[in-house]
Design a protein with these regions (language model features):
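Hinge/lid segment of periplasmic solute-binding proteins
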Residues: 93-147, 199-204, 294-296, 372, ...
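A structural signal for short loop-to-beta-strand junctions that line the ligand-binding cleft
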Residues: 77, 85-86, 116-156, 304-309, ...
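Glycine-centered hinge/linker elements that transmit conformational signals in sensory
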Residues: 175-176, 182, 219-255
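Extracytoplasmic/periplasmic solute-binding protein
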Residues: 134-143, 148, 173-226, 270
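Extracytoplasmic "Venus flytrap"/periplasmic binding protein-like
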Residues: 50-123, 155-167, 264, 268-272, ...
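Short, solvent-exposed loop/beta-turn-alpha elements that line the ligand-binding surface or hinge
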Residues: 108-123, 209-236, 285-288, 299-308, ...
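Long, aromatic- and glycine/proline-rich binding clefts that accommodate carbohydrate-like moieties
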Residues: 293-300, 348-411, 415, 445-451
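Extracytoplasmic/periplasmic substrate-recognition and gating elements
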Residues: 26, 137, 158-160, 239, ...
Length: 451
């Protein structure tokens, strides 16, 4: 059902350009729907409140939809009813779906039409390239941008004679065994849901310079095919992970077992995790008192040269079907959240990174990264910009129905770790099922050229 719904996103969005809610008498109001939940949802609401309190003409009504997936589905349903929000947050995985719908007001055009001058080159290239067209046009505003990092318990590593995090997965395997021998029951905590495909599969391919799919991971055409299963480095890595799991060097942690891997790390129960830099703030607030921990860039595999990791998180899209008065509010809101001072506040209360060079430089001048609890977050920027400008490796993933593709990959991982299925056969099956999804998406947009 979910795949059918997302597969139809283009048709639904492209034909439902109806007018939004009437403007309020005193302030011009617009709706902003976002997918974040929990602590991050509170931080988004605080940002909306700061904007609303900064002036007296506009009001942005910000409403969490509970998840990225729900945010996209609810936006589709709202178009059906002619009640679409002015701003909608769409995750990295949903970028191509909405990009091909034509149901949006391009970010660069919006800001120009509303009288704002934006230095689009100020955005970090690793972030901008993910959301830009082939001509470099920005269709949406990068918002809560992140990448994956390795979190490690420095106290535990000290007990095994180590003062640094593993730089390669081979070194990591040795560290996990040493931690186990030292009495730690959970050297590595991980999960195998569709959410974790991002850091364990996609980011692995990224930092090792390998492709998830042909056609530059889909950036060069809708006829892209998944090929991650044909990468010997990835296959060997998954076999290593399964071996660590079988030998209790790696432990699955999620809500079903009563503790997520992030919670397990913060409690000091597990010593290493891979997760978003966006979790840095939450871990800093919830970590066991006195626990000494840090972050590092993701390990590479063997002798592979390090490449840039992929940006995660989401961007903000302005939807068609609203008045110029409402679009003025949207433009003012985007201008507000782009200020370096706001970037500092946002990065302070979350773990997300500044999306612009100017914001990053402002944070450095303020000494943001000089000490705990924020030290180390700059590694996310280093990870996203590790490759030289001449690097020909893919700089992201642009596949239709990527959420469903991730689900099929997760199903393959579950077969491996839960049912002891063959690694290569399971990855091949996941790729085959994912390619079927891609072909259906391609058929939906037959003869359409990527922007």
């Amino acid at each position: 059902m979910q795949a059918k719904l997302l597969g139809a996103v283009g048709a639904l969005l492209a034909t439902a350009f109806l007018a939004g809610p009437a403007a309020a008498a005193e302030k011009t109001k617009i709706d902003f729907w976002f997918g974040n939940s929990g602590d991050i949802a509170k931080r988004v609401q605080e940002q909306c409140d700061r904007f609303n309190q900064s002036q007296g003409d506009y009001e942005v009504v910000c409403t969490s939809q509970g998840s990225y997936d729900a945010s996209l589905q609810n936006t589709i349903a709202a178009f059906r009813a002619g009640k679409q929000p002015t701003i909608a947050q769409v995750s990295d995985a949903g970028t191509l779906d909405i990009m091909l719908s034509g149901a949006f007001y391009p970010a660069n055009q919006l800001m120009a039409d509303m009288g704002y001058t934006v230095d689009w080159k100020d955005y970090f290239s690793g972030i901008a390239n993910y959301y830009a067209t082939s001509k470099g046009e920005m269709y949406s505003f990068p918002f809560n941008s992140s990448t994956a990092l390795l979190y490690w318990n420095k106290d535990a590593f000290t007990k095994i004679g180590k003062d640094h995090a593993p730089a390669t997965w081979q070194e990591a395997g040795e560290d996990f065994k040493a931690l186990k021998d030292a009495g730690y029951a959970c050297p590595l905590a991980f999960d195998i849901s569709n959410n974790e495909v991002w850091q364990y599969i996609e980011q692995f391919e990224a930092v090792n310079g390998e492709a998830i799919a042909t056609k530059k991971n889909g950036f060069e055409g809708l006829d892209a095919e998944l090929v991650f299963n044909k990468n010997p480095l990835l296959v060997s890595y998954i076999k290593d992970l399964k071996s660590w799991y079988d030998n209790k060097l790696a432990v699955i942690k999620n809500k079903a077992v009563g503790q997520t891997f992030v919670e397990a790390f913060a409690a000091g129960d597990c010593q290493v995790i891979l997760t978003s830099v966006g979790d840095h703030g939450n871990i800093g607030r919830t970590a066991k008192q006195g626990m000494n921990w840090g972050v590092s860039m993701l390990p590479t595999y063997g002798n592979a040269t390090r490449h840039s990791s992929y940006v995660g998180g989401a961007s903000l899209w302005v939807l068609k079907g609203h008045s110029d008065a409402e679009y003025k509010v949207a433009a003012a809101f985007f201008n507000f959240i782009a200020k370096p001072e706001e970037a500092l506040t946002w990065s302070t209360v979350t773990g997300y990174i500044p999306v612009r060079n100017s914001g990053f430089e402002y944070l450095k001048k303020q000494g943001f990264y000089d000490k705990a609890p924020y030290a180390g977050r700059e590694l996310a920027i280093q990870s996203l910009t590790a490759s030289p400008a001449s690097d020909t490796a893919p700089h992201g993933i642009r596949l239709g129905g990527l959420l469903q593709v991730r689900t099929e990959i997760a199903n393959g991982l579950q077969a491996i770790f839960v049912n002891n299925a063959d690694v290569q056969a399971s990855l091949d099956g996941a790729a085959d099922r994912g390619n079927q999804l891609l072909r259906r998406f391609q058929q939906t947009y037959k003869n359409v050229q990527l922007p």
